Design a protein with these regions (language model features):
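Gly/Gly-Pro-rich "capping" loops immediately C-terminal to redox-active cysteine motifs
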Residues: 42-66, 78-126
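Intrinsically disordered, low-complexity linker and terminal regions at domain boundaries
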Residues: 117, 121-138, 142-144
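The canonical Cys-X-X-Cys-His
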Residues: 23, 27-39, 49, 148-155
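Post-cleavage N-terminal segment of exported redox proteins
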Residues: 1-17, 38, 151-164
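Low-complexity, glycine/serine/threonine/alanine-rich intrinsically disordered linker
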Residues: 75, 95-99, 108-110, 126, ...
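Sec-exported extracytoplasmic/periplasmic mature domains
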Residues: 7, 28, 66, 70, ...
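Glycine-centered loop/turn positions within well-structured domains
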Residues: 30-33, 99-101, 130
Length: 164
């Protein structure tokens, strides 16, 4: 399992002459598109990464991937619904209709849904756990991770300075 201590210095000092093709392959291998929009492709269940390079440094992007629950956008924060019988359901609200709440319980499958009767709800809390799993970089080596981050920062443009 990678740490920010291991990858942070490289994110600050080794972001030139990265490999675009490897970065693009790693973006696919790490399943980023399952939840994140990038250009004209990908999911809508996580933040759009197209302009991430204008908002985050390489260091910050690595920190977000290593620690996805550190900061969760309100737009993508799951909720935990506790029912009167103490059963719980977690997910992203996709529909509120009268006495019914529909949650997407699996962000990689938009059809995985649970309907909750609001009249039987004991409590609703915003989850402190990101739907983005930890360990997404575990199977990649350091060079592949840096190429992946360069790819995201570039917005998918091979002529970006990170690849020169």
């Amino acid at each position: 399992e990678w740490t920010l201590g291991e990858l942070g210095p490289a994110a600050r000092n080794e972001m030139k002459k990265r490999d675009f093709d490897t970065g693009k392959r790693m973006f696919t291998a790490a399943a980023c598109l399952a939840c994140h929009r990038f250009g004209n492709a990908g999911g809508m269940n996580g933040p759009d990464l197209t302009g991430a390079g204008g908002r985050f440094s390489a260091y910050d992007l690595i920190d977000h991937v290593l620690h996805p629950s550190k900061e969760i956008s309100d737009q993508f924060a799951p909720i935990v619904v506790t029912m009167e019988d103490d059963d719980t359901v977690s997910g992203i609200v996709v529909n509120l209709n009268g006495d019914s709440v529909t949650l997407n319980t699996d962000l990689t499958n938009p059809n995985q849904r649970a309907n909750v009767d609001r009249r039987k709800v004991k409590s609703i809390e915003v989850s402190k756990i990101s739907p983005m799993p930890e360990g997404l970089l575990a199977a990649l080596n350091k060079s592949e991770i840096l190429d992946l981050v360069a790819y995201v920062i570039s917005g998918g443009h091979p002529d970006h300075p990170a690849f020169r």
